[in-house]
Amino acid sequence: MSDKLPYKVADIGLAAWGRKALDIAENEMPGLMRMREQYSASKPLKGARIAGCLHMTVETAVLIETLVALGAEVQWSSCNIFSTQDHAAAAIAKAGIPVYAWKGETDEEYLWCIEQTLYFKDGPLNMILDDGGDLTNLIHTKYPQLLSGIRGISEETTTGVHNLYKMMANGILKVPAINVNDSVTKSKFDNLYGCRESLIDGIKRATDVMIAGKVAVVAGYGDVGKGCAQALRGFGARVIITEIDPINALQAAMEGYEVTTMDEACQEGNIFVTTTGCVDIILGRHFEQMKDDAIVCNIGHFDVEIDVKWLNENAVEKVNIKPQVDRYRLKNGRRIILLAEGRLVNLGCAMGHPSFVMSNSFTNQVMAQIELWTHPDKYPVGVHFLPKKLDEAVAEAHLGKLNVKLTKLTEKQAQYLGMSRDGPFKPDHYRY
């Protein structure tokens, strides 16, 4: 790999703009700044060669530079062909960190970019930071000879965590992994509050549509679906939920949402959002019953929720309105507006989640990398969680920015509750 390019980005000339954006983001990411303050001197990640596969955004750039400040060598690719922010990638490349990512990669280029991150000047990767599982899967299937040298995987998102548990159940997983997604300060913040803001940003930038008065259909009522439903309702839409899980369906109903099937909802909706992480959510028979100019988008990790293939094969006309916005005309004369080719709408059509909420998620990522690198004996092959105490530390690091003042337990109160005055304050089974 000695002839490897030092980086490949869309335009290195965007680096100065990217650096300005990073400077602003750092002020909105107190958790990562706390990590730098605590650990930049001791360098707990010294010797770690981290291959990262996660959306190459401004916020991710702050994460990357935090990992480097803590002693790691880092090489990076994006986990989605549309999610790279080219100015952020340029800033990281200009800083001398190998990054292989640009907005609008082909599927072949996407794989090439990931493969560039596997070998460092001193040897192959020994840590994985993944989002969605593509890097994890690639190494397990195509580069299994590298597995023995890898200490751990930290996985960012719901889809990637599902993949890890599936691999574990099938006896395929060969490396210890930490499920970052299900840290409370990730899933209950990034998935919920992040989507609550970035979904609307993506839809508005793509279409300028008026949401008030429309009928919006949200497929799935997990944390992501909850955030999306709140956002659409907040803008004045009447929101319909589809669900497979009776508990989530009951939650949605108790919040005042109508809950029905996609076969029924497809006839009513003006805006459709898939959030499930599953396949075949919106199919050809649904498109055929939709209203004219229905807007269809996805905020789950992969492009498998919406049957884009059916649209491409059955529409009589496809018109590209602008990048990541396509209008299909069906045989019945009605049009469908598809955003980001069925991939992540908030990153394909907008800038993704705000920096502050990503600081929660990425502080968990840094902690997971430190845990796996410095305490390998604690983590056998399997899927693990960060300790509750670290979850609480992530939250605490973000309180000052919001002027939050915590109440401190008295010694008497702590004894009454049977806990330390310093936490952890909830048992592991507590759901928040």
Curated annotation (Swiss-Prot):
It is found in: Cytoplasm; Melanosome; Nucleus; Endoplasmic reticulum. Binds 1 NAD(+) per subunit. The modification Phosphoserine is found at S183. Keywords: Acetylation, Copper, Cytoplasm, Endoplasmic reticulum, Hydrolase, Hydroxylation, NAD, Nucleus, One-carbon metabolism, Phosphoprotein. One of its GO terms (molecular function) is adenosylhomocysteinase activity. The modification Phosphotyrosine is found at Y193. GO terms for cellular component: cytosol; endoplasmic reticulum; melanosome; nucleus. It holds the Pfam family AdoHcyase_NAD. Pathway: Amino-acid biosynthesis; L-homocysteine biosynthesis; L-homocysteine from S-adenosyl-L-homocysteine: step 1/1. Substrate binds at T57, D131, E156, K186, D190. Belongs to the adenosylhomocysteinase family. Catalyzes the hydrolysis of S-adenosyl-L-homocysteine to form adenosine and homocysteine. Binds copper ions. This is Adenosylhomocysteinase. It comes from Macaca fascicularis (Crab-eating macaque). The gene is AHCY.
